[in-house]
Amino acid sequence: MKKILFITFGLLMTATIVFAQQNRVTSILEILDVTTGKRSVVKEFPFQIESPNWTPDGKWFIYNSRGRLYKISAENPGEPVEINTGFATSCNNDHVLSVDGKQIAISHGTREDGQSRIYTLPIDGGNPTLITAMGPSYLHGWSPDLKYLAYCANRKGNYDIYAIPATGGVEIRLTEAEGLDDGPEYSPDGKYIWFNSVRSGLMQAWRMKADGTEQTQMTFDEDLNSWFPHVSPDGKSVVYIAYNKDEVKPGDHPANKNVVLRLMPAEGGKPKTIAQLFGGQGTLNVNTWAPDSKRFAFVSYRLESNN
């Protein structure tokens, strides 16, 4: 989920200009091989990009930047190609691909009220179809049978996990815990939904059955707030991002922080840190695993002074 703070246009422009005058952001699209621990740079961008999806055929990364979606070759990265999303030009970093590689689901801030809603469209671009009538809704998962989307939504003042038919319909509330539940993602066999929740006091990774039953805590990181668990395509591993609890509140996932990427067995067990980097928001919001389950993509950042 990417929370959006609505302030006056003048204040927003002032804040943006001040930040731009002081710093410029370099985004580094990287790959990490979990078998060797090796990190490799795919491409650097002199502006902010977020949340790369690795396409099921292994050929492309799809990411968001400045409200639009782009794709870039995973094998021979050259110039990015913009994906036509029609009227949806305020896409945030919550976008996922169908497992058959034919569709993409996006979260777009609608012009009428600025709230994020979920849409689907062909993966090569096209006119988006509205799925969630209510907002805010932040997409994170698509079931492997293609029948349901899972998302985080604020309804009546609380953020919980919901599912909805992928063609639209009545949404189904899956969690009712006090506080933030976020980042729902289906396991490759469709039996479980992984998500993160503050219900234990810190943000931790949880797992439940796809119908919302048997909600079980999966990480117990005493010094970390752990976000966005992503299951590998073979169903064996989970990677997630974590913040130091002394630097970031449990319900926050800001940009431009020192963070770690952690790896754990999908059936539970002790996680291990596999990378340290400067990032946070936009680094690993959505599933970024390669089809071979040996690598995943992420974005790290570098702030450089304009002075």
Which residues does each PLM region occupy?
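Sequence signature of WD/YWTD-type beta-propeller architectures
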Residues: 21-307
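Bacterial Sec-dependent N-terminal signal peptides
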Residues: 1-22
